[in-house]
């Protein structure tokens, strides 16, 4: 009976160690890959595409409660 207990203990200890992924198995965080994800208002219409009215002789954009207002700089 003790041999069965030892075998069961060994199996229970080794199984979780092999079932868990190790750190080197994890994919590395790649900032370049995240930058390739194009999150633009053309793809996602819920994003507010803020217009620019700044330029020579023009006013700078202002936002009030997420509404676009052209105001003075």
From Swiss-Prot:
Expressed by the venom duct. Shows a paralytic effect in fish. The keyword Ubl conjugation does not apply. Belongs to the conotoxin M superfamily. The modification Pyrrolidone carboxylic acid is found at residue 51. This is Conotoxin CnIIIG. Transmembrane segments: none annotated. Residues 1-19 form the signal peptide. It is found in: Secreted. The cysteine framework is III (CC-C-C-CC). Classified in the M-1 branch, since 1 residue stands between the fourth and the fifth cysteine residues. The lineage of its organism: Eukaryota, Metazoa, Spiralia, Lophotrochozoa, Mollusca. Its main location: secreted.
